[in-house]
Every structure is written in structure tokens, then in C-alpha cells.
């Protein structure tokens, strides 16, 4: 199974992936951001901007790596990464589904204030990139079709992991 955990920056994607990895047999966390850094970092300029999803190779490389890790290495994979574009969902997750891989999308949601406060708690400062783009990430991730939405406001990691496991079963 491949489980993509989306939502705005600071909503708890990585924290919840870490909470799930010990509860899902033979699972690992896949860092799609590292793929994005590699793709974008090898261009002498940023021809497609700063959003990884705008780089055509980002979708293709994630698709290929996830497919290989699942089919040839046998892993269940957790991917904590904001998806902003339906097109990215289609190019990665829908293709994996068409290949017969059980693929799920969980979309975490929280109020602006909750996300803002969580970003500050992890050590970021006002005016940082993720802080400046909270609304873009909230709106973009909430419009991607094909996922199960989970509200995270006022809930513990344990409560959210339990709900996620129920959704995945």
C-alpha cells in the first residue's frame, strides 16, 4: 500500500507518518521533498518556480521510485508531502492505482491559526516561506479529489493515528 499524506505545511503530515510507520507492517517513510530538491537543484535556474509539483520530472521520479519501492522492494510506503495540484495526484497516485497498487490519499486539514501556531512551534519564524504560503497550501491541498479528509484541530497524535488506521483498514 502507498499512503500519501497531504495537507498544508505544519498540519502534522510528518508527525503522523512517524506515528503510523510502527503500526503498519513493513512500512517506510518516503521523502518526496528530497526528490524535489534533487530535481530543482540540478537546474541552473528555477525555470518552473519553487513549487516541486510544477517540475514535470518531480511527478515522474516520484511515480517511478514509489512503484519500485512497493513492487520490487515490498514496502508499504508513507509519503508526507503537500499535494497542491490535481494534475500531480493524477500523474503519481492515479498511475500507481492503474498499475494495480493499493494507493490511498489522506488529506489533513486545520484552521489557519492552528497551522500558523504549529509552524511557529517547530521553530520557523514569521515571514518564512511556509508561513507566507499557508493559505495557498490549505486551499490547494483541500481541492485535490480522491482523498479522505481528516480534521486535525484539537486532536492528539494518538487520536489521529487511530482514525487514519481505521480509514486505511
What are these model-predicted stretches?
Residues 5:
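Hydrophobic anchor at the beta1->P-loop junction of P-loop NTPases
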Residues 18-62:
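Conserved substrate/cofactor phosphate-moiety recognition/catalytic segment
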Residues 14:
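Walker A/P-loop
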Residues 8:
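P-loop (Walker A) phosphate-binding loop of NTP-binding proteins
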Residues 99-119:
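Conserved phosphate-donor/acceptor-positioning beta-strand/loop module used by diverse small-molecule
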Residues 11:
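ATP-binding Walker
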Residues 121-163:
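Small-molecule kinase domains that catalyze NTP-dependent phosphoryl transfer to phosphate-bearing small molecules
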Residues 54-99:
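Glycine-rich phosphate-binding loop used to anchor ATP phosphates in small-molecule kinases
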Amino acid at each position: 500500500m502507498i499512503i500519501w499524506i497531504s495537507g498544508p505545511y505544519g498540519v502534522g503530515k510528518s508527525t503522523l507518518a512517524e506515528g503510523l510507520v510502527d503500526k503498519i507492517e513493513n512500512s517506510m517513510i518516503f521523502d518526496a521533498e528530497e526528490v524535489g530538491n534533487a530535481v530543482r537543484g540540478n537546474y541552473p535556474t528555477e525555470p518552473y518556480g519553487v513549487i516541486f509539483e510544477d517540475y514535470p520530472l518531480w511527478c515522474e521520479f516520484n511515480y517511478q521510485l514509489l512503484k519500485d519501492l512497493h513492487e520490487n522492494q515490498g514496502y508499504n510506503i508513507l509519503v508526507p508531502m503537500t499535494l497542491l495540484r490535481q494534475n500531480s495526484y493524477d500523474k503519481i497516485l492515479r498511475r500507481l492505482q492503474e498499475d494495480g497498487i493499493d494507493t490511498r490519499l489522506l488529506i489533513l486539514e486545520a484552521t489557519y491559526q492552528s497551522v500558523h501556531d504549529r509552524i511557529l512551534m517547530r521553530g520557523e519564524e514569521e515571514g518564512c516561506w511556509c508561513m507566507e504560503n499557508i493559505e495557498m497550501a490549505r486551499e490547494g491541498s483541500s481541492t485535490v479529489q480522491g482523498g479522505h479528509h481528516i480534521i486535525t484541530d484539537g486532536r492528539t497524535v494518538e487520536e489521529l493515528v487511530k482514525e487514519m488506521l481505521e480509514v486505511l483498514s
